[in-house]
Curated annotation (Swiss-Prot):
Cofactor: binding comment: Binds 1 zinc ion per subunit.
Organism of origin: Thermococcus kodakarensis (strain ATCC BAA-918 / JCM 12380 / KOD1)
Protein name: Alanine--tRNA ligase
Domain observations: Consists of three domains; the N-terminal catalytic domain, the editing domain and the C-terminal C-Ala domain. The editing domain removes incorrectly charged amino acids, while the C-Ala domain, along with tRNA(Ala), serves as a bridge to cooperatively bring together the editing and aminoacylation centers thus stimulating deacylation of misacylated tRNAs.
Similarity comment: Belongs to the class-II aminoacyl-tRNA synthetase family.
UniProt entry tagged with the keyword Cytoplasm: yes
Cofactor: Zn(2+)
Length: 917
């Protein structure tokens, strides 16, 4: 892409455009003597030990300095916007927020929703795993950082500001507010592309550090049929102009604070409250600061993901400071581990506070990665402290700015403790898993563990590569751990989130795209049972009406059924679906329907009202779950039926009986209070600002305007389902059971209204019947059942004892029947007893040079072969079944089965003897 990026400021204030001889990129500078662009690796850090900002700032001070500057700017006042959660509930194509612009994708960028302010300023906590293997080493990389930004959305005919103003605002902030030296600032031209958008951009560099990026987003991915004259190429992809042009900036909060301190690493400047206690706990020796400074200067020019070799960095640093690589490693490794722990635990604090539940999928997988990587680092440092202790340090430090951390503290720390215990259990089981895999590799003559197996051990079993290597190398198998291992696994997880399946419709969208939107009578009056409508189109066995009271399947609520009356004949409606904004009804006799004909619809009301009870009941139950279990609870799915409903929630451990009783009690209290249930259509941004992102409990809701359902002082969600006007109409809510359907997800099965009454009546009937059988009153059933169970257990013990005695007698009797067949001792007999009796006796009789064949009168058989014989019990079992039918199998030394014809048992034993002889 070629574009003139000469701004007003560059032209009027004497800036010079130069080409960097090292990277070949163009940049702007006020310094006529400057040769290079200022970006590593073209330039080293020039602020380590010599801060580039006169005043030392804390994170809070720098953030406020930035936001206030833009909020109160005389010419361009910006609306200050609160941070968004790092878990992006408003979109389903990414796992975590990695930049401030992601807060406004896709809805604001596409024009489907208005921005909360325009222009706006924000400081957005952002999490990126693409740099995880650099964290702790380079001094500048974080998994969690705050991207301070100012954004302007230039809609057609409504310009705000563009390149000239953006560059001037950045320069003004840096030089007038932070007192940076103008001649040391460079603006490097480097086009940007990401998330399907692109545009020209400046990287703002100061003394070797990129402190901001100014992107002018004006292109979107080109469709296949794009006008060639409109297409531009940026970084190998093709784009066309967007209607909305967006100023997308990002200023690194941590980097600017680091610049003001000039410490060897950014971690020292912003995470000291964790780093210093960890250094004391680990007994880390203070080292020559020159080593850390030189390490940082060179590491700033290094990226593990690009170079893939940490050893190269070590060699270069060691050479510069005049020590061996081993001495350098010993000196800096503890610092790198502590830096990484401090960063990872801060990221975890944000993730868990915003509702991420550690698991094996999606964002939960990335949270678990951070937990286990941090634990591993602690162990390498020789520290046995709980990880929760470090997370608590972050909560204490950050809560004044992020009060939600204090509110969520108990849950956050409990999650960490639960995960640490799970990891310990994983490690106990892990060694055997690795050994089994190694045995398979050895059989194939492979002496190195493939990378895909290393990743599989981590993803499926949570075994870090270091643990796998430790076990494998003891077994003589080499393990090569890539320096960017964690980056690889994180990228794979993020790729899975980007995969979106295309919508599948019951009929081709092209067949209905020209039809008017179907009028949704079920929203206008959810209690409408009958209606008249006109047929607009018939497509196979689907009928399109101009309006309908039939609810189409969606949002976990099943479709309505009923009848459509046409020309005096009642036709069953068996399915209702929505394609775009057109509703289709599947009918049994489509040939009766003609375009323009008026029909009369009648719903199966019993089905609909029960769906409504369960749907409103789901919202009531969700409110109770959040209040009892915590704000981390999030809806992970739901499905309604007439007899029962299910609600899946994110939760990190099993729900206890006590918690279930409290949840059920709260839900039924809300029902009895007969709270109002109301709904309204609101512009998306207004709804988000009014109610927050808990709106999206049921998932991402498309559209500029969304339907918001409110249960008075209890629950608010964006929801497209049909609901009751008050909670009293739900009737009783009864939780039937809970299930753990996957890691981090609990399923609650419940019934409401008539379905709950039916369940309670059936339970009562069964209780009464059980009481009759025991001949006790219903209230005595539990203790009576327990008594019977204990008596049964005692009787079972006695039976087992007698069985063993019988087996001893059987063994004693059979030992008298040993005969010599060829070179083998042989015992063969038809006996009384169960398969367990036979197995017990055969195992007792089995000796090194002996074969035992026992067949019961019911047809069960057991074959035992001594260890000293070159025979397989399974082969002898085949001889038995070849004579008497049936089947069986087993290990080399023991096989069992059942024959079809017990009358041929003796004959089968003789056949085995023949084979041995």
């Amino acid at each position: 892409m070629s574009m003139d990026m000469t701004t007003r400021m560059f032209k009027e204030e004497g800036w010079i455009r130069k080409k960097c001889p090292k990277c070949g990129k163009y940049f702007w500078t006020l310094d006529p003597d400057r040769e290079t662009c200022g970006d590593p690796p073209c330039d080293e850090y020039q602020f380590i030990g010599k801060p580039g900002i006169p005043k030392k700032y804390t994170l809070d001070e720098m953030r406020e300095k930035f936001l206030s500057f833009f909020e109160k700017h005389e010419s361009y006042p910006h609306g200050r916007v609160k941070r968004y959660p790092v878990l992006p509930r408003w979109r389903d194509d990414v796992l975590l927020v990695g930049a401030s612009i992601m807060d406004f994708q896709p809805w604001v960028i596409s024009g489907e929703a208005d921005p909360p302010a325009n222009p706006l300023t924000i400081s957005q906590p952002s999490i990126r795993f693409t740099d995880i293997d650099n964290v702790g080493i380079t001094g500048r990389h974080f998994t969690i950082f705050e991207m301070m930004a100012h954004h302007a959305f230039n809609y057609p005919g409504k310009p705000i500001y563009w390149m000239d103003e953006t560059v001037e605002l950045a320069f003004e902030f840096f030089t007038k507010e932070l007192k940076m030296k103008p001649e040391d600032i460079t603006f490097k031209e480097n086009p940007w592309a990401g998330g399907g958008n692109a545009g020209p951009a400046f990287e703002v560099l100061y003394r070797g550090l990129e402190v901001a990026t100014l992107v002018f987003m004006q292109y979107k991915k080109a469709p296949a049929d794009a006008d060639p004259s409109q297409v531009v190429e940026i970084k190998g992809d093709y784009y066309v102009p967007m209607e909305t042009r967006v100023v997308d900036t990002g200023y690194g909060l941590e980097r600017l604070v680091w610049m003001s301190h000039g410490t060897p690493t950014a971690y020292d400047a912003v995470l000291g409250y964790v780093i210093e206690p960890l250094k004391k706990m680990a007994g880390v020796e203070k080292i020559d600061e020159r080593i850390l400074m030189e390490n940082s200067r060179l590491a700033g020019m290094f990226d593990i993901e690009d170079m893939g070799d940490l050893r190269y960095l070590r060699e270069q640093v060691a050479k510069r400071v005049g020590i061996s690589v081993e001495e350098l490693e010993k000196a800096v490794r503890p610092y790198e581990l502590i830096y990484a722990i401090a960063d990872h635990t801060k990221a975890l604090t944000f993730m868990l506070a915003d509702g991420v539940i550690p698991s094996n999928v999606k964002a939960g997988y990335l949270a678990r990665l951070l937990i286990r990587k941090s634990i591993r680092h602690l162990r390498e440092l020789g520290l046995e402290i709980p990880l929760a202790e470090i997370v608590a340090m972050h909560i204490k430090e950050l809560s004044p700015t992020f009060p939600e951390f204090k509110e969520m503290e108990d849950v956050i720390l409990d999650i960490i403790n639960v995960e640490e215990k799970r990891y310990a259990e994983t490690l106990r089981r892990g060694s055997d898993l690795v050994k089994r895999e190694i045995a398979k590799l050895k059989k194939k003559g492979i002496n190195e563990l493939p990378l895909e197996k290393l990743i599989l051990f981590y993803e499926s079993h949570g075994l870090t590569p270091e643990i796998v290597a430790e076990v494998a190398e003891k077994e003589g198998i080499k393990v090569n751990i890539p320096d960017n291992f964690y980056t690889l696994v994180a990228k794979e997880a993020e790729k899975q989130a980007e995969k979106k399946e295309a919508a599948e419709y019951v009929v081709d969208f092209e067949l209905v795209k020209d039809l008017p939107d179907t009028r949704t009578l079920y929203y206008e009056d959810p209690f409408m049972k009958e209606f008249d409508a006109r047929v607009l189109k018939v497509i196979a066995d689907w009928v399109v009406l101009d309006q309908t009271a039939f609810y189409p399947e969606g949002g976990g609520q099943p479709y309505d059924t009923g009848v459509l009356e046409v020309n005096g004949e009642k036709v069953k409606v068996t399915n209702v679906q929505k394609v775009g904004k057109v509703i289709l009804h599947k009918v049994e006799k489509p040939e009766l329907f003609k375009e323009g004909v008026t029909v009369h619809g009648r719903l199966d009301w019993d089905r609909r009202i029960q769906h409504m009870r369960h749907h409103t009941g789901t919202h009531v139950l969700m409110g109770a779950l959040v209040r009892v279990l915590g704000k981390h609870v999030w809806q992970a799915g739901s499905q309604l039926h007439t007899d029962w409903a299910r609600l899946d929630i994110s939760h990190y451990k099993r729900i206890t009986e006590e918690e279930l009783r409290e949840i059920e009690r709260l839900a039924n209290r809300v029902v009895m209070e007969n709270r109002k249930v109301t709904w309204e259509w609101l512009p998306r941004t207004e709804a988000e600002m009014k109610y927050g992102f808990r709106l999206y409990q049921g998932g991402v809701v498309p559209g500029r305007v969304i339907r918001v359902l409110k249960i008075e002082d209890w629950d608010v969600q964006a929801c497209g389902g049909t609901h009751l006007p008050n909670t009293g109409l739900i009737g009783p809510i009864k939780i039937l059971r809970t299930e753990r359907i996957q890691d981090g997800v609990e399923r609650i099965i419940f019934a409401a209204g008539e379905a709950a009454i039916n369940w309670m009546q059936e339970t009562e009937r069964l209780l009464k019947r059980t009481a009759e059988i025991f001949r006790v009153p219903p209230e005595k059933v539990p203790e009576t059942a327990e008594r019977f169970f204990n008596e049964w257990k005692e009787a079972r013990k006695e039976v087992e004892k007698l069985r063993k005695e019988l087996a001893k007698l059987l063994v004693y009797e059979l030992q008298e029947k040993v005969e010599k067949v060829g070179n083998v001792e042989f015992i063969g007999a038809v006996v009384e007893g169960t398969i367990d009796d036979l197995r017990e006796a055969a195992n007792r009789l089995r000796k090194e040079n002996r074969v035992v064949v026992l067949i019961s009168r019911e047809g069960h058989f057991v074959v035992a072969v001594g260890d000293g014989l070159d025979l397989k019990a399974g082969e002898l079992a085949k001889v038995i079944t070849s004579v008497a039918g049936g089947g069986g199998g087993g290990r080399k030394e023991l096989a069992q089965g059942r024959i079809k014809n017990p009358l041929k048992a003796e004959e089968a034993i003789e056949e085995v003897k023949k084979m041995l002889g």
